[in-house]
Amino acid sequence: MNGTGHPANVTGRVELEDTGTELVARDGATELMRYVYRPESSVYEGPKPYAHPLRTLAGDVVSAYRPNDHRWHKGLQMTASHLSGQNFWGGASYVRELGGYTDLPNVGAMRHEEFTGPGRERLSWHTQGGEHWVDEVREMAVDVEDDHWTLGLSTSMTNVRGEPLLFGSPTTHGRPMAGYSGLFWRGPRSFTGGLVIAEGGQGGPEMMGRTASWLAYVGEHDEVDRSSTLLFVAAPGTTWFVRTTPFAAVNPSLAFRQEVELPPGATWSHRYRVVVADGAWDRDRIEDHVRSHPLDDGAAPGEGRS
């Protein structure tokens, strides 16, 4: 690993550069990921760290940044669309009484505080009014294999507000099949209409609101004659927010249909793996990969595979 400044957890062939506002992971001449931990975002867009661009080993971009339909969609990022009346997502909030979205002075920010060890980041969540509600520890690892690379990600969120926090979504507030909250990926325009493959023979846009421990999205690129696959692995029983139209998006939701209460002082932890692969992986290839790379393989959160 070659780094300048803050450490990160990467395997031997990955080089890392810290610019003071971003961590850039490279495999040779290919930039795989740019993790922007000090973003220049407006309050309305919900300032928070994000990973964009994400690229395959072949160099194809597999994420979107500030699309004109949702300016707060930025690659891959951790979010909370409804948190005790606050919006750590960005943009307008869904209001049950109005039956729609409206702009409110409730858009919070997730602030990078420091890197405390290899791949380990400390963040704090603040409401638009300046109240400190959550302390988060986020751990990341980057690992490269023959035709794909993997981002391992874990998050531990601790309630420091002094009263219960309720994690929800537009669906918990009355909008059907819109339960987005948590780790969210926005795909490039060319991935619109892509293929969704999920655990247990499931697949397609019908995965919206269904449960699975993993879900893959296969999309085709513009300009080059190539496809790419993103595989998202989460805990068993995860409910997914997924769209293929009008845009590509995947989210293992924190609170799709029911609010989750986090008591004062309590910590809520989640672990994910995102595989970025060259080519259109079929179900057999995906299932083989999941079997050989179990999420609960005993590695510590953020620990890479050697």
Question: PLM features: what roles do these ranges have?
Answer:
Residues 228-305:
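Beta-strand-rich recognition/accessory modules
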Residues 22-27, 117-124, 151, 217:
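Generic recognition of long tandem-repeat/solenoid scaffolds
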Residues 77-147:
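Extended, loop-rich substrate-binding clefts of extracytoplasmic carbohydrate-active enzymes
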Residues 58, 125-129, 140-144, 157-161, ...:
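Beta-strand elements of well-folded, non-transmembrane domains
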Residues 119-121, 136-138, 151-153, 183, ...:
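Hydrophobic residues positioned within well-ordered beta-strands of beta-sheet architectures
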Residues 35-38, 43-53, 145-194:
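Acidic (Asp/Glu-rich), glycine- and aromatic
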Residues 164-235:
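Active-site/ligand-binding surface loops and adjacent short beta/alpha elements
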Residues 2-75, 145, 164, 168, ...:
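Beta-strand-rich N-terminal accessory domains
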